[in-house]
């Protein structure tokens, strides 16, 4: 293929456009051979082998050298193996039934090499003109038709993942892509010469074949009108029936795909040619960017372009606006001294202590002072003072610089009005360390005075006037406070109860230290009168009840029952109080004596019942 501007000699060895395959790489690789067979692609390689081929054909030059050469030069099909061979076609087959072999592959992978498309097939213009002149003068109408620029665009998406064997007799240096663009504009007259003439016309046109493959390398040349973004892997081949030239291989019927229309009938009107140069440029640029993005193995990240500098306009409203001298008699609303007074103070007097960071007491310094009639403010002694932070830290501040512009919003802004010198704020020399001036009180009953007093209260209610403490100093009570015995749970005093065991009837009925028994412990008391029947006492209750009831003091806490673990421990190891002592025998003897005496008394009572 000879593109315009490519004047390389014909004797330069041409290279194939096919990328390096797995077999040729493994044959030269020093690594150990893989476990897979030699010609079988892996699953990853099958997934990655998807070729997008774009064929751009355009006739860049319409006028050729006059056909005055001799006819002694043989055709490039027989003279040079490195020229683009054109598969011939019999007259019986029309041009629309051209079959494309999508799976054709070179048989010997060891002889593959790589070269960009622009250097693959380079034929000299003189040889092309001589071979064109060999067709005879009877082909002149067809030549005029072929000289018209007729661009063609063919896009074929091929899946080459399947591993089919190539056709037999395939020449290893032949290209796999030929576009019969002009077959529809020719008449099939002679079986031999006309097919040979059509092959020469196709070779004369610059054909741009673009293949996007992961192994392709971008190569460009300065003399090309359309540089290719990557090397070519030929995706398909035009397979036709053989004619006179014996170099055309016989295609395998198993490798043929269904008949597709030609590129000229797809994208070009048959009557009037039309130019596709802008479309070719846009497609080429898009495909170049696509190949550069997706098929670059390791693309170094480039830093982003420097952004243009951003211009920010910040407008801050300062407390003193442009004042006209005609409006200087209007009174001020702000509770701080005027700005001109601060300007005079900054240049004439020593630096005073910095004002607080409150709402209205940081005043701006907007430049050189005007020679005004404002009275100077007495300077405060520069001494270290504690900073007024809300955090409560006690850091000692250094001597503060002169006050700076107050960029915070005023509580009561001036609103562009001046301040009368008669109502200048009066500052005393005994003011605190933080510079604070009290403005003179305006007229009574005015709303300005109320606003002034409200601003004062707002300043004094700042959190800096409060005593701040750390949270860790507060004691967190984890256990509740025990209740006092002389107070009720509500905090009321308890009634004093008598520590008695025997109560009179009056005390009981007057509810003095008496608690009515609950339903669970309804005991009969001594006040019940038993009835005597047949010499026996009958009580109202059916069960045996206790006569004496010990009333405990309710103010005293109840004795808690020992837990089960304490009981078991006490049963195993006796306490010293419960341990047997040496006086147990004497105590038992005394108890037996008392029992004997009691029995004797009962017997005597039975014998003499009248004594009761």
UniProtKB/Swiss-Prot annotation:
Residues 546-563 are annotated as: Required for nuclear localization. The modification Phosphoserine is found at residue 307. Residues 243-252, 366-379 have a biased composition (Pro residues). It is found in: Chromosome; Nucleus; Nucleus lamina; Nucleus, Nucleoplasm. Disulfide bonds: none annotated. InterPro entries: PRR14 (IPR026320), Tantalus-like (IPR028149). Interacts (via proline-rich region) with GRB2 (via SH3 domain 2). Interacts (via N-terminus) with CBX5. This is Proline-rich protein 14. It comes from Mus musculus (Mouse). The gene is Prr14.
């Amino acid at each position: 293929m000879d593109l315009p501007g490519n004047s390389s000699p014909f004797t330069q060895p041409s290279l194939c456009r096919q990328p390096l395959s797995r077999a040729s790489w493994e044959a030269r690789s020093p690594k150990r051979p893989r476990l897979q067979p030699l010609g079988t692609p892996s699953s990853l390689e099958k997934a990655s082998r998807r070729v997008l081929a774009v064929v751009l054909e355009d006739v860049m030059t319409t006028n050729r050298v006059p056909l005055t050469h001799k006819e002694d030069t043989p055709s490039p099909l027989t003279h040079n193996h490195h020229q683009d061979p054109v598969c011939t076609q019999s007259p019986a087959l029309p041009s629309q039934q051209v079959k494309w072999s999508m799976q054709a592959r070179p048989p010997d992978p060891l002889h593959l090499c790589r070269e960009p498309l622009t250097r693959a097939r380079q034929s000299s213009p003189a040889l092309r003109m001589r071979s064109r002149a060999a067709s005879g003068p009877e082909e002149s109408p067809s030549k005029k038709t072929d000289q018209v620029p007729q661009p063609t665009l063919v896009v074929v998406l091929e899946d080459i993942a399947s591993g089919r064997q190539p056709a037999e007799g395939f020449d290893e240096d032949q290209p796999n892509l030929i576009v019969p663009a002009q077959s529809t504009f020719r008449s099939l007259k002679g079986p031999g010469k006309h097919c040979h003439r059509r092959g020469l016309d196709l070779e004369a046109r610059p054909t741009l074949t673009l293949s996007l493959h992961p192994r392709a390398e971008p190569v460009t040349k300065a003399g090309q009108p359309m540089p290719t973004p990557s090397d070519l892997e030929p995706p398909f081949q035009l397979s036709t029936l053989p004619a006179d030239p014996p170099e055309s291989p016989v295609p395998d019927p198993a490798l043929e795909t269904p008949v597709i229309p030609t590129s000229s009938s797809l994208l070009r009107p048959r009557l009037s040619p039309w130019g596709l140069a802008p479309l070719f440029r846009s497609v080429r640029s898009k495909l170049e960017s696509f190949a550069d993005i997706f098929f670059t193995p390791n693309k170094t990240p480039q830093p982003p372009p420097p952004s243009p500098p951003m211009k920010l306009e910040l407008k801050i409203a300062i407390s003193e606006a442009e004042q006209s001298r005609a409006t200087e008699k209007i009174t001020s609303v702000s509770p701080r001294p005027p700005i001109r007074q601060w300007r005079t103070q900054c240049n004439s007097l020593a630096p005073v202590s910095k004002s607080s960071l409150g709402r209205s007491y940081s005043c701006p310094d907007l430049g050189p002072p005007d020679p005004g009639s404002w009275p100077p403010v007495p300077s405060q002694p520069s001494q270290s003072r504690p900073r007024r932070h809300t955090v409560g830290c006690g850091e000692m501040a250094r001597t503060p610089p002169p006050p700076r512009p107050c960029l915070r919003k005023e509580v009561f802004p001036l609103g562009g009005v001046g301040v009368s010198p008669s109502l200048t704020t009066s500052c005393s020399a005994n003011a605190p360390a933080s510079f604070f001036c009290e403005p003179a009180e305006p007229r009574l009953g005015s709303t300005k005075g109320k606003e002034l007093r409200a601003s004062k209260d707002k300043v004094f209610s700042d959190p800096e006037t409060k005593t701040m403490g750390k949270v860790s100093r507060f004691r967190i009570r984890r256990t509740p406070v025990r209740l006092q015995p002389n107070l009720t749970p509500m905090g009321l005093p308890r009634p004093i109860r008598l520590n008695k065991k025997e109560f009179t009837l009056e005390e009981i009925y007057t509810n003095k230290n008496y608690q009515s028994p609950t339903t669970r412990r309804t005991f009969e008391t001594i006040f019940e009168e038993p009835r005597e029947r047949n010499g026996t006492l009958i009580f109202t209750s059916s069960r045996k009840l206790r006569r004496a009831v010990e009333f405990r003091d309710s103010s005293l806490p109840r004795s808690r029952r020992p837990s089960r673990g304490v009981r078991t421990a006490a049963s195993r190891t006796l306490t010293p109080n419960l341990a047997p002592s040496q006086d147990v025998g004497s105590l038992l003897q005394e108890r037996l004596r008392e029992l004997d005496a009691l029995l004797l008394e009962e017997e005597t009572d039975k014998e003499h019942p009248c004594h009761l």
